[in-house]
Amino acid sequence: MSKVVVLNDKLEKAGELDLPSKYAEVNPHNLYLYVKSYLASLRANTAHTKGRSDVSGGGKKPWRQKGRGGARAGSTRTNVWVGGAVAFGPTNERNYFQKVNKKQKRLALERALADKAAKGALFTADSLAIESGKTKDANAVIKKLGVKDALIVKDLLDEKTLLAYRNLANCYVVDVTEVNAYLVSVFNAVIIEKSALESITKEG
């Protein structure tokens, strides 16, 4: 069974909690599909080439059809001409959206949490608030745990905690309503407030 490491006020291990057993039984393909959809939604649709109807010029036939010994040509803007159109090139009309059902999103999150717990990289504490709002205090939390990077999940994200973590390159803080399977998967460790963890497991 997947275990969540419980931390005390000093961020030391104080015990373990069990994740629901069904989390580890979720097909990992659900996680793959969600991450694929999430990354596709981040793609910037900027690559664009001009087709025959987009390029300027080329309305006049460059030379007569017959009698001069060369290949026939009807326009100087076909894809075989320098300065002409591009055949089958990318356009900015493409839609990269990939639909993922609400249930599948939920299953993906459950699997991601189970994978983190199996690696001993899922932690929970009563409070993760940084009341001082200082980055050095937030950095001390990460150093204390000895992890390379971490996702911090708050039940209710306050401004001071956001300011404290915002300037850390190896840390990202989110409200529990914004957590998703991709964020859980991409960080080496996940630290969730106990009340936030309860709301996540309750939904499932």
Curated annotation (Swiss-Prot):
Keywords of this entry: Ribonucleoprotein, Ribosomal protein, RNA-binding, rRNA-binding
Pfam assignment, any one: Ribosomal_L4
GO annotations of cellular component type: ribonucleoprotein complex; ribosome
Region feature Disordered, mapped onto this chain:
49-75
Q: Which domain of life is it from?
A: Bacteria
Indicate yes or no for the key word Methyltransferase: no
Q: Which GO terms describe its molecular function?
A: rRNA binding; structural constituent of ribosome
Q: Which Gene Ontology BP terms does the record give?
A: translation
Q: Coiled-coil region(s) at which residues?
A: none
| Family note | Belongs to the universal ribosomal protein uL4 family.
Describe its partners and assembly state: Part of the 50S ribosomal subunit.
Record-linked HAMAP family:
Ribosomal_uL4_B
Known role: One of the primary rRNA binding proteins, this protein initially binds near the 5'-end of the 23S rRNA. It is important during the early stages of 50S assembly. It makes multiple contacts with different domains of the 23S rRNA in the assembled 50S subunit and ribosome. Forms part of the polypeptide exit tunnel.
| Name under which the protein is recorded | Large ribosomal subunit protein uL4
Q: Which species does this protein come from?
A: Campylobacter jejuni subsp. jejuni serotype O:23/36 (strain 81-176)
